[in-house]
Structure formats: structure tokens, C-alpha cells
């Protein structure tokens, strides 16, 4: 399987980074400056739309199943 790494050097301010279809996430370091209300609310948040009843989730599930099927054929 080919790997296409994504390197993120910095995320600052009121930023959100969404990473879809990640097999593993290996940060070199994680830090946050706490300022203002809610500043102590830190941590990694993992969300999944696999159980959602919306059409976008159904499309995501179809892509996931297609990837799983492709991987099983490649590794067989």
C-alpha cells in the first residue's frame, strides 16, 4: 500500500483540522496556550459519522466499504 503522508507544521488561532480516512495519527508534539474562557478545554476529539442517517454519511460508508474491499483484494 502506498503512503501519502501529510505534514502539518502548525495550527494556530481558533483553528480546526479535520482529517478523514486516517489509519494512524502520530503527532510529534501537541501544545496549547490556555487563554480566555474555555481555554482549559484541550484534547483530541475524534468524531465519526458512521451511524448518521444523513445522505453524506451513507456516501462516506460506501467509500469506506469500497476501500475495505479494495484492501482485502490487494492483501489476499
UniProtKB/Swiss-Prot annotation:
| Domain of life of the native organism | Bacteria
Transmembrane spans:
none
For this chain, the family text in UniProt reads: Belongs to the GerPA/GerPF family.
Question: Mind telling me what this protein is named?
Answer: Spore germination protein-like protein YdzR
Species this protein is from: Bacillus subtilis (strain 168)
The gene name on file is ydzR
